[in-house]
């Protein structure tokens, strides 16, 4: 039996819609896999009651099918579904890495990304690499149709998850189909700043690069209290704040010494709106690990 820990992720990061992603030190899914004649799935942990165990409807079932690797698979969810933290991607990433090793398929980590993305498509409806790439490879990733570029970055983060449900499909439906030229110019500049900040481990540049005037404002309307939480986090010292993935998690970049205060402030801001939330004081971390 193999055990794989695959991290939660934050995709988009404001200016990198459907392209940027980072692996988080915490939370994570833990998946145990053992060779078998057919695929069976058992799910426990956060939000497990909402996750189908039918292999045809579960992310890991699709991954097992793509790798022709039947197994008994136990998923312990540390990443809540519909959180904006790459819940389905974490399970798919763990399955891809684990089954690749269990069956000695010989794929590289980068080659496993599109395989895991097929699994995530079972939930989201489309195969996107921006969550599975960092969950498999770790660090900061840039996923395009040409492949994945990865950078080992070290940026402190605060991820605040409110007790609000925002489905990936709903979040995609509100994305604008067009953008003004000035918005695109600003987005390119912000994306360049964020990428440079990741290379330099510079929270200030990363935070500046998280600003977005196209997708984030549209999705913010689905998250009660987003603007208040964002403003409170910035006032507490965050260098940048945006929506993690499809939401509802709100993620902030910061200096190490400000992280605790920002976490407390974000919780309080959601509380003032009558919204319960939990917070992760985390940072950019590594990819899936096999034990």
Swiss-Prot record:
HAMAP family: Homoser_kinase. The keyword Cell membrane does not apply. ATP binds at residues 80-90. Its main location: cytoplasm. It is found in: Cytoplasm. This is Homoserine kinase. It catalyses: L-homoserine + ATP = O-phospho-L-homoserine + ADP + H(+). InterPro entries: GHMP_kinase_C_dom, GHMP_kinase_C_sf, GHMP_kinase_N_dom, Homoserine_kinase, Ribosomal_Su5_D2-typ_SF, Ribsml_uS5_D2-typ_fold_subgr. It holds the Pfam family GHMP_kinases_C. The gene is thrB. Pathway: Amino-acid biosynthesis; L-threonine biosynthesis; L-threonine from L-aspartate: step 4/5. Its EC number is 2.7.1.39.
